[in-house]
């Protein structure tokens, strides 16, 4: 889910509007190389924690953070959401997040139910979970390929 072609494909979806609604202290789950960073509304952000376990993506993510002018507010957290000890080192604790942002990430977590419980626990009362997940393709060839694979939709 990397690169400009993927980002262009998101343009005509709800993703840009959803990301722009993220506010306050934000936990971005699986930011990858930072595809969503240009979509943030900087005036609504206090702090962003990008929880990204794939350290091979961190260099590109840092470049994108800098290019988007978010270096003062964006912190890469080099672990998965299940690593409570590492999250706590960064100040990510229960009832601490205003927004949790998850764009096309939850399909790849090892234990979805546990992950959702953990995310909910991290949100402040009245916080928001901003989420967009993959849907079954309307393209006939892609739909055929998807139907041959396990595809929760």
Predicted regions and their residues:
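Local beta-strand N-terminus motif with an aromatic residue
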Residues: 23, 45, 94-98
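Conserved class I S-adenosyl-L-methionine
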Residues: 128-152
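Conserved alpha-helix/loop element of class I SAM-dependent methyltransferases that forms part
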Residues: 2-25, 33-39
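Class I SAM-dependent methyltransferase SAM/SAH-binding core
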Residues: 25-86
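A short acidic, Gly/Pro-enriched loop at the edge of an enzyme's catalytic core
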Residues: 82-100
